[in-house]
Amino acid sequence: MRGHKDMSQIKAVISGVGLWTPEHSVTNDELVESYNAFAEKFNAEHVDSIADGSVEAKPLSSVEFIEKASGIKSRYVYVKEGILDPDRMTPNIPLRAEDELSDQAEISLKAAKKALTAAQKSATDVDAVIVSCAYTQRYYPAIAIEVQNALGIEGFGFDMLVACSSATFA
């Protein structure tokens, strides 16, 4: 893109792709055990409200239901701690300081480095960073800008935030 004045002469090339897969995973067995403990605790704590109809009981789940409904047997997770805690049911991801890379930028950076290696390119060969993500950890800066800065890429950065379809749009 550098040096081009006529946009018709720009040729976009994807010369490498990179993927980073988290080291942790949660199986359906683990998920069902944790969720059912959460549901049983909730139902026990709200027994009177459930009986009078003001609160709906949490149904129990099963491995078979999850696999039939989604086809998923296991899912990779960035941070496993907290996900299977029936009192929490969400990952425990500590907040980072504003001057640190966001968790999402750190993940993107790992994938970007793999893409550069696959393409046999360096950061100076890259004109644009496009990041697709379902949501962002911070309002500013954009994840693509964080990746650009971390790798020393010139050009532009763009976050494509299209919820669950982000990857398909990118």
Question: What residues fall within each predicted segment?
Answer:
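Short pre-catalytic strand/loop immediately N-terminal to key active-site residues, enriched for Gly-Thr
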Residues: 155-161
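A glycine- and small-aliphatic-rich helix-loop capping segment at beta-alpha/alpha-beta transitions
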Residues: 142-153
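Short glycine-rich or small-residue beta-strand-to-loop segments that form or flank ligand, phosphate
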Residues: 127-134
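Active-site-proximal alpha-helical scaffold in enzymes
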Residues: 161-170
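Secretory-pathway/luminal and periplasmic proteins that interact with or process carbohydrate-rich
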Residues: 135-141
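Conserved "HGTGT" condensation-loop signature of ketosynthase/thiolase-family condensing enzymes
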Residues: 2-125, 151
